[in-house]
Curated annotation (Swiss-Prot):
NCBIfam families: rplB_bact (TIGR01171). GO terms for molecular function: RNA binding; rRNA binding; structural constituent of ribosome; transferase activity. SMART domains: Ribosomal_L2, Ribosomal_L2_C. Belongs to the universal ribosomal protein uL2 family. One of its GO terms (biological process) is cytoplasmic translation. GO terms for cellular component: large ribosomal subunit. Part of the 50S ribosomal subunit. Forms a bridge to the 30S subunit in the 70S ribosome. This is Large ribosomal subunit protein uL2. Residues 222-272 are annotated as: Disordered. Residues 263-272 have a biased composition (Basic and acidic residues).
């Protein structure tokens, strides 16, 4: 795992960097665990744009990932570490003792040939999935469930890890990468270790076309729009907009947008 630099043969390649993919052991995905997903381009079922700056991008197969880790008590051997175009982390192909194959998020340090398990009463080892009540305090974890049997929802991107801080009754205190401390049911499962591909944050995209290949469209400044499109739009020449920075709907910049009030009681400390 490392970063590869390019010779500055053009302006677009002068600062661009790439992964060297040295940890990848197989190029082709396991076909039974792939499927096609239609791109929505940020549109809803009425064709209206609900998420800006999306569209285009390279074609890719979706790899079906096992976020639940619900095959308990059966050892699985790591067959290969693979690239997944749908996420920043690497994925690992498991072969269970009963012959079933599954993909999981590859933790950092996992190698081909290693054996991992999930369930209660197993060893505290990188790649193993256990309920929070059985994990020692201070352990680095990822792929954390929010509710029992709900599948991993938190801490899934490259290089991230959460820390188990305390246990109190039926809840555990988990410190997330954002700095937020959250109460999570002790029966929820989490995977031991840190997510793979630690160098992901150091990759320099380097040129606009590479961002378009990822399916991201250009972002237009509000002051460059017309008055009908944005509160900062219009004016003669290059104007500043005449007011404080705001959203296209007039809300001041920096206003909290979190809507889920029923789970506020589970947040002990807000993110930084």
């Amino acid at each position: 795992m490392g970063i590869r630099r390019c010779k500055p043969t053009s302006a677009g390649r002068r600062f661009v960097t790439y992964h060297d993919f040295s940890e990848i052991t197989k190029d082709e995905p396991y076909k039974p665990l792939t499927t096609c997903i239609k791109k929505r381009k940020g549109r809803n079922n009425q064709g209206r744009i609900t998420s800006w700056l999306k569209g285009g991008g390279n074609r890719k197969l979706y790899r079906i990932i096992d976020f639940k880790r619900n095959k308990h008590g059966i050892p699985a051997k790591i067959e290969s570490i693979q690239y997944d175009p749908n996420r920043s982390a690497r994925i690992a192909l498991l072969k269970y003792m009963d012959g079933e194959y599954r993909y999981i998020l590859a933790p950092d340090g996992l190698k081909v040939g290693d054996t991992i398990m999930s369930g209660s009463g197993i060893d505290i080892k990188v790649g193993n999935a256990l309920p929070l009540k059985e994990i020692p305090l201070g352990t680095m974890i990822h792929n954390i469930e929010l509710f029992p049997n709900g599948g991993g929802k938190l801490v899934r991107s490259a290089g991230t890890a959460a820390q188990l801080m305390a246990k109190e009754g039926k809840y555990a205190h988990v410190k997330l990468p954002s700095g937020e401390v959250r109460l999570i049911n002790v029966n929820c499962f989490a995977t031991i270790g840190q997510v793979s591909n630690l160098e992901h944050e150091n990759v320099i995209i380097g040129k606009a076309g590479r961002t378009r290949h990822m399916g991201r469209r250009p972002s237009v400044r509000g002051v460059a729009m017309n008055p009908i499109d944005h509160p900062l739009g219009g004016g003669e020449g290059k104007s500043s907009g005449g007011r404080a920075a705001c959203t296209p709907w007039g809300k001041p910049e920096g206003v909290k947008t979190r809507k889920n009030k029923r789970t506020d009681k589970f947040i002990i400390k807000r993110r930084k």
